[in-house]
């Protein structure tokens, strides 16, 4: 399918969603990503190497923009604010480094901050490498080489996690009422915004898969094409990188074309899934 037709299809879906203003005319298989559960086990291999404490800031040194309030209707705005943080560097086997900023309003001491950073750093080491570290064959929205996750802010509040692909960072809100303790699937969701979205959304095979499936994997995936990618990636991992036979059948029945399109995309772009073995 040529690029013009692909763009036309994208515009058509966006227009229809804006006009409908509701989910009732859209089909989806799972109500939310949490219905998938965790796809990574505690003892699974990890590319995480070490966590280094760097320092604790003072005087409200850092400026950032919060996630939106966690509301069913997605209302509310992000707020820019100043904060202090315990700063850590997580190092992975490839040498990739992620800066962790643990807000002092959430972690009241360095021990709690380190425990939080270490927990998430280990989980991030278990997800596919191309989500964590990007790839020379992927690029972001300003056409620069995808660098994957470079910074994570662990903050206080029942807010929505959100990713900023320009800054290669995302927010983690452990107090978010809809997030499970393991959080591996939502980590992959946010990581996909930093590494995968831009190039995949211009892929003709992926666009055709959206048309052919006539189904979204979750209710939230209907929000936008970027959210469709981000929601789908964890289900692809469940199908191709784990032994969860029961749920595989349900996923493949719902979005077989997207799963196959991701297979091709990962292979064609030589994307590493380390430490997971996917196929």
Task: Outline where the language-model segments fall.
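Classical Sec-dependent N-terminal signal peptides that target proteins to the secretory pathway
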Residues: 1-20
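Intrinsically disordered, low-structural-confidence terminal and linker regions
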Residues: 21-54
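Auxiliary, metal-adjacent structural segments of Zn-dependent hydrolase domains
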Residues: 50-168
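Second-shell loop/turn segments in exported
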Residues: 105-115, 173-178, 215-223, 247-249
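Sec-exported extracytoplasmic/periplasmic mature domains
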Residues: 129, 192-200, 235-242, 267
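Short pre-active-site segment immediately N-terminal to the catalytic Zn-binding motif
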Residues: 171-187
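Active-site recognition of the HExxH zinc-binding catalytic motif
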Residues: 184-199, 230
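Metalloprotease/metallohydrolase-associated module, dominated by Zn2+-dependent proteases
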Residues: 209-279
